[in-house]
């Protein structure tokens, strides 16, 4: 497949009107590179674990970070901004992750989508953690969905790629979704150059798409197993996983997420820092490429903090749990 065919294939998978591949290290960078968030726009974002990307990537815009993914928080941060769905703008953007932020929050995308349209805001969803297998943001009300493709490519792509998808504007009974129509017009006119993919990159992405569903289900199933192990482990605390009834967004997640509750689990250490914990583990837990078959750990609050974020691979969860257990007992 060439780039156009891959973009068309992604659009079909995402239920999108149009899709574009972008070279970018992460979704906020891709959103900035697309150029659809323009000077004079306001960007309201919940991404407390990615605040620096918004502080430096949208210099000409009015960026407001909110502390909660709730409708009330976004509406409050949008007051006083005169906006519409006219292409000329200025535009109001709402940004959330389908799973993200500290604690792996799951916003009510249906409620946010409805409120965004009432406020004349364009809802953008970073769908990287849940991915298109685990969440359908465009169906739930997003005007734009972006997803880093590390896991889609099984960590084999030589560059960091992001897929951007815009919602269809045709609703039931021949009604037009003004938000989606505005987003598509901005998307079509952004002037971003078509991505120049090598034959190797195209092959990796094509192969990744063909095996996507089975691999994603494996990631999700292993995350659930590891979350249940950690929740029962007395050597850690505050296990955050949307599939656990203790998670603050569990009820919302059951209606937003599909095929499980994503590949990520967070927990807090009790007796050591993240950096000390990493030193007790095999290097592959930290050095394996993102999105690959090996379970990977990070420290979202820094190595001096106590929070660990785990992304389940497709490796044996019993072996992973045993390795974690041995490190926790040292």
Regions inferred by a protein language model and the residue ranges of each:
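N-terminal entrance/gating region of PLP-dependent enzymes' catalytic architecture
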Residues: 1-5, 12
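Conserved PLP-enzyme active-site core in the AAT-like
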Residues: 9-235
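Generic surface-pattern signal
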Residues: 79-83, 191, 279-286, 329
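A structural alpha-helix within SAM-dependent methyltransferase catalytic domains
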Residues: 113, 325-328
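Short intrinsically disordered coil segments
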Residues: 177-181, 282, 327
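Conserved C-terminal alpha-helix-loop-beta "cap" of PLP-dependent enzymes
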Residues: 231, 235-326
């Amino acid at each position: 497949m060439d780039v156009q065919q891959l973009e068309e294939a992604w659009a079909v998978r995402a239920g999108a009107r149009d899709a574009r591949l972008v070279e970018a290290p992460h979704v906020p960078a891709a959103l900035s590179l697309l150029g659809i968030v323009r000077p004079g726009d306001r960007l309201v974002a919940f991404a407390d674990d990615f605040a620096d990307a918004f502080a430096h990537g949208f210099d000409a815009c009015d960026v407001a970070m909110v502390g909660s993914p709730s409708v009330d928080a976004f509406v409050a941060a949008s007051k006083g901004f005169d906006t519409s769905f006219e292409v000329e703008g200025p535009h109001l953007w709402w940004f959330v992750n389908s799973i993200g932020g500290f604690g792996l929050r799951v916003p009510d995308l249906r409620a946010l989508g409805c409120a965004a349209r009432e406020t004349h805001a364009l809802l953008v969803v970073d769908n990287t953690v849940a991915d298109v297998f685990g969440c359908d943001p465009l169906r739930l009300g997003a005007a734009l969905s972006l997803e880093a493709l590390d896991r889609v490519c099984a960590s084999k792509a030589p560059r960091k790629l992001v897929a951007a998808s815009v919602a269809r504007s045709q609703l039931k009974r021949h009604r037009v979704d003004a938000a989606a129509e505005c987003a598509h017009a901005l998307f079509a006119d952004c002037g971003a150059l078509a991505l120049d993919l090598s034959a190797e990159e195209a092959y990796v992405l094509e192969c990744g798409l063909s095996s996507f569903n089975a691999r994603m289900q494996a990631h999700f199933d292993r995350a659930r197993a590891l979350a249940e192990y950690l929740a029962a482990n007395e050597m850690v605390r505050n296990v955050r996983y949307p599939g656990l009834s203790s998670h603050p967004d569990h009820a919302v997640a059951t209606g937003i997420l599909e095929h499980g509750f994503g590949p990520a689990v967070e927990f807090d250490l009790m007796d050591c820092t993240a950096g000390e914990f990493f030193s007790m583990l095999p290097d592959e837990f930290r050095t394996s490429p993102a999105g690959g078959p090996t379970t990977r750990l990070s420290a979202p609050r820094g190595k001096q903090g106590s929070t660990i974020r785990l992304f389940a691979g497709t490796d044996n969860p019993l072996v992973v749990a045993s390795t974690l257990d041995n490190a926790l007992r040292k």
